């Protein structure tokens, strides 16, 4: 059952919201198409502090230039359903309650195994921009399962009554602006929260797909412009984490700043 309640969000500060852009497909010299290539900056690594988390909501707190949304601190149910868990949190912030398994069940699936190339990496596999790729109970390093990118998650959010907007190229300023408005944000990065150079496989339809081991999606729930930090729920472990804005911005580059915003329609 989906339960709707009036949202309760506190926020302080004002940032400029940049317009969303659609994910392009590039035509390569050999006539094939590709999702965008990502260029990574060189930035220092940062220690990631953790706090214990339960299924109870976090406390909404504000200070000058800071926002922390009321969000449940939950853990993903399955090995690779971080995107569904992240959306569950994002919807809950908007007071739209949808079970994690229901979100995952609504996603299009491509369970076909990959074609492994000569270096032991997938040369062909499904397109996570269209489907959940692989077995949700699989293991990424063995390429038995992978995940899903933002377009199907946008569709799922809209299915449950939210307004969702997804694109690549998210910046920290855009994230903070959305949080200031009380909107939820989900960002794609890797589970070690560090920048990586993505690899590419070719989808069944010939489109090149960027990928990285440890693909992960997290709901961002707060920021502090004085401490220069970003706070999010790590649904892999069910904890709240805080990174420096510099470290978070670097981690986002692995998937080209991929993310979605989610807001209520009431």
Language model segments and positions:
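Noncatalytic regulatory segments and standalone regulatory/sensor domains
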Residues: 158, 180, 201-212, 219-266
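Mid-length scaffold segments of soluble, non-membrane domains
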Residues: 134-172, 177-180
């Amino acid at each position: 059952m989906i339960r709707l309640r009036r949202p309760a969000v506190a926020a302080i500060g004002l940032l400029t919201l940049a317009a969303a852009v659609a994910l392009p497909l590039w035509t390569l010299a050999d006539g094939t198409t590709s999702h965008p290539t990502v260029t990574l900056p060189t930035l220092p690594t940062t220690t990631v502090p953790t706090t214990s988390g339960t299924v109870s909501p976090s406390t909404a707190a504000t200070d000058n230039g800071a926002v922390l949304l009321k969000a449940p601190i939950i853990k993903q149910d399955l090995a690779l359903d971080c995107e569904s868990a992240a959306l569950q949190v994002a919807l809950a912030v908007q007071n739209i309650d949808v079970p994690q398994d229901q979100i995952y069940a609504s996603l299009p699936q491509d369970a076909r195994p990959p074609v492994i190339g000569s270096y032991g990496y997938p040369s062909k596999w499904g397109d996570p921009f269209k489907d959940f790729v692989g077995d949700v109970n699989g293991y990424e390093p063995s390429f038995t399962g992978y995940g899903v990118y933002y377009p199907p998650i946008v569709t799922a959010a809209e299915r449950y009554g939210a307004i969702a907007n997804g694109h690549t190229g998210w910046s920290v300023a855009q994230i903070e602006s959305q949080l200031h408005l009380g909107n939820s944000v989900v960002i794609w990065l890797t589970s070690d929260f560090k920048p990586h150079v993505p690899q590419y496989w070719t989808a069944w339809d010939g489109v090149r797909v960027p990928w990285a081991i440890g693909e992960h999606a997290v709901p961002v729930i707060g920021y502090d412009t004085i401490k220069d930090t970003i706070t999010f729920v790590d649904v892999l472990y069910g904890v709240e984490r805080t990174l420096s804005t510099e470290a978070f911005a670097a981690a986002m580059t692995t998937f080209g700043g991929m993310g979605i915003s989610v807001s209520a329609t009431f």
